[in-house]
Each structure stands twice: as structure tokens, then as C-alpha cells.
Amino acid sequence: MKHKITVGSRDSALALWQTRWVVEQLEKQNPDVTFEITTMKTKGDKMLDVALAKIGDKGLFTKELEVAMLQKEIDFAVHSLKDMPTALPEGLIIGAVCKRDNPGDALISKDGRKLDELPKGARIGTSSLRRCAQLLNYRPDFQLEALRGNLNTRMKKLVSEQLDGIILAAAGITRMGWEDMIAEIIPFQVCLPAVGQGAISVECREDDPEILNLLKGIEHTETKAATEAERSLLRYLEGGCQVPIGAHSEVKNNRLMLTAVVATLDGTKVIRAQGENEVNKAVELGIEVAEKLMAMGGKKILEEVRAGE
């Protein structure tokens, strides 16, 4: 085993928190190994004035780290799983998926009001088409405003742009120690989360058995299965950041359950499907639920969304 391992991370406060957390877990299990964190900015970190849907999604928050891995400048990289494309560059693999935190979306409102308590025509900040579509389906009166930037920036915009509320991933808020600011975790019946939301993943080289073996110690089997089902569904639907697809999978009574949604951008139509399978059939479950969505009208919705890009 190498005695010094170089770990890649984006340089945002949340990304660094997640990377340090992974390193801490590995240090407990491997006290003789030294870990060094190296940070870099990704394309998604630099292009803050453009909506995610307009930039495209392939490796927006991962590519620079992946290039560094392939060039052997770093040994592995820590990501939010929801930022990882469903198809990874040749030679790279997800070496571990850690135990998932709350996968839901959280509402932070200026006066602590819940979603149902917000006034008619409330201005809500979010840049996710998935959130926009589902929220408009629930409350067509909402005025949705684009919201980019890191977590600190987004929190400031709640006040500076006089928004009634902003929607962020609950896990990120909690990791930053801001859970007291959450007015409500939005129920899945209202808004299903992004694929992989709430889970931290570690990407490494496929041909690096030492690192792969090291990462086994932080893998969480149930989270891995659940997120594999979600990513399989997304891969089948060929969806990325710019497509309104939500999904959530979990293990219940030794069965893997998956619920997913496809929506029109304006929220006028939301198609929901679910399925279950054995825990070791995650990929099959994802495809099965994706096929249900397509048959129920999801195919037409996705074609229309892509035609309008």
C-alpha cells in the first residue's frame, strides 16, 4: 500500500467538507497512510452566470478531476454522486458510495414558512429543472428564479434578491451545519430528488487494485444498490441536469424499491412510476421503472424537452 495518497476535490466549502469526511473515515481504518488533498475548479464552478441546463451536463463538476486521475496526478476524487455522469470516462470507476444522508430537497424560507404557507406568487430560487417542474405541478402560482453559485452564495441571494424561499439539497445544508435554517424537507410526493442526491461517491482508476481495496472500507452496500438503480434509470432515459427527472430508491424488507418521475418543464404533466426487485438486481430495476415511465408518456415528454433545448 502506498504510504501517501493524493485526493482530488473541488474547492467549494461543501466539496472540501465531503472530501475531508471521506479522508477521516479512511484514516481511522488506515492509520499508516498519509492523505493529501488537492483542490481544483471545474467548468461548473467557473460558469456561474449561465443556467446549468444551457451549459450541458457531461462531467460539468467532475471532468477536471477525472483528467487529473487519468494523468495519475491524483489517486482518487470525491464527488457528490448526483454530479457524476452515468457514463464515466474509460479507465475510471466508482470505487465507493458512502452511506447516504437525507436524499430530499429542503426549503429555506425567509421567515421559516413551509411550502404550503408561502404566499400566492411566491418567488422561489432554484436552478434545477427537476425541482422547477415538480414545484410548478404542485403550486402553479410559484415564480421560479434561477439560482447558481455555491451554497454560501445561494443563501445570500435569499436576502439580496428578496426571494420568499430557496430550494437546496438537504444533505449539503446539513453537512455545512445549517440544518436549523431548514423550514421543511419537501415530501417525495411533491418533489422527488435528483438521482444519487445525498450520497458521497469516490471515483478512482479501474486498474488501481490498492485504491479499490482501500475504498471497500467506506462502501455502504444499501446506498450502493439504491443509487445504482437510480443511475440505471437515468442512463436508460438518457437524462442529465437539463432533463426534469427525479428518482429515489431504498432498501425495505430486503427488497429494493424505486420511485421515479418525468415531468414537462412547465409542470403541467408529471408521470410517476415505481417498481421493486431483489437488492442485487439494481440495474434491472432501474431499466424496468424507466420502461414504465416511457410507456406512460415519458418518451413524448423527453422528446419535447430535448427538442426545445
UniProtKB/Swiss-Prot annotation:
InterPro entries: HemC, Porphobilin_deaminase_cofac_BS, Porphobilin_deaminase_N, Porphobilinogen_deaminase_C, Porphobilinogen_deaminase_C_sf
GO CC annotations, alphabetized: cytoplasm
Record pathway: Porphyrin-containing compound metabolism; protoporphyrin-IX biosynthesis; coproporphyrinogen-III from 5-aminolevulinate: step 2/4
Modified residues (S-(dipyrrolylmethanemethyl)cysteine): 241
Domain of life, per lineage: Bacteria
Cofactor: dipyrromethane
Cystine bridges: none
Coiled coil, from the record: none
Biological process terms in GO annotation: protoporphyrinogen IX biosynthetic process
PROSITE patterns found in the cross-reference section: PORPHOBILINOGEN_DEAM
Single GO molecular function: hydroxymethylbilane synthase activity
Keywords linked to the UniProt accession: Porphyrin biosynthesis, Transferase
Note: The porphobilinogen subunits are added to the dipyrromethane group.
Subunit text: Monomer.
HAMAP family tied to this protein: Porphobil_deam
Task performed by this protein: Tetrapolymerization of the monopyrrole PBG into the hydroxymethylbilane pre-uroporphyrinogen in several discrete steps.
PANTHER family, alphabetized: PORPHOBILINOGEN DEAMINASE (PTHR11557:SF0)
NCBIfam families reported for this sequence: hemC
The name this protein goes by in its record: Porphobilinogen deaminase
Source organism (scientific name): Desulforamulus reducens (strain ATCC BAA-1160 / DSM 100696 / MI-1) (Desulfotomaculum reducens)
Lineage of the organism: Bacteria, Bacillati, Bacillota, Clostridia, Eubacteriales
